[in-house]
């Protein structure tokens, strides 16, 4: 199962709706023994965009780590402004079973950035 974080919702109800969708998809994937990959927006994960986007990205990363702790194969990819290698890493994380609970950051957006 591959879940792509959408653009930041307009309100908290939108955040709740996205998280509920991610929960249901992840629950089914976990029950079926399918690997889970969340594709996150790097700027949101770093808190460099909207508050609601940051809440959403952080909650999804927490879900990945919880799923992994519960013995599921679950990982995340944080995609920056250039998604050039995203599909490659998504496929790697989805098609393997040795790595779980990890976050792969793509692009240099997180290096040397001060939170603003």
Describe each region flagged by the PLM.
Residues 83-116:
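C-terminal substrate-recognition "lid" of short-chain dehydrogenase/reductases
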Residues 1-84, 88-96:
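Rossmann-like short-chain dehydrogenase/reductase
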């Amino acid at each position: 199962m591959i879940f792509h974080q959408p653009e930041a919702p307009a309100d908290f109800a939108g955040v709740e709706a996205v998280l509920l969708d991610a929960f249901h998809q992840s629950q089914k994937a976990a029950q079926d023994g399918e690997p889970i990959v969340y594709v996150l927006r790097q700027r949101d994960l770093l808190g460099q965009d909207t508050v609601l986007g940051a809440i959403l990205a952080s909650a999804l990363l927490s879900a990945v780590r919880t799923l992994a702790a519960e013995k599921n194969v679950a990982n995340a990819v944080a995609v920056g402004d250039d998604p050039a290698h995203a599909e490659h890493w998504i496929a790697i994380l989805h098609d393997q079973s040795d790595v779980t609970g990890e976050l792969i950051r793509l692009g240099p957006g997180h290096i040397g950035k001060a939170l603003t």
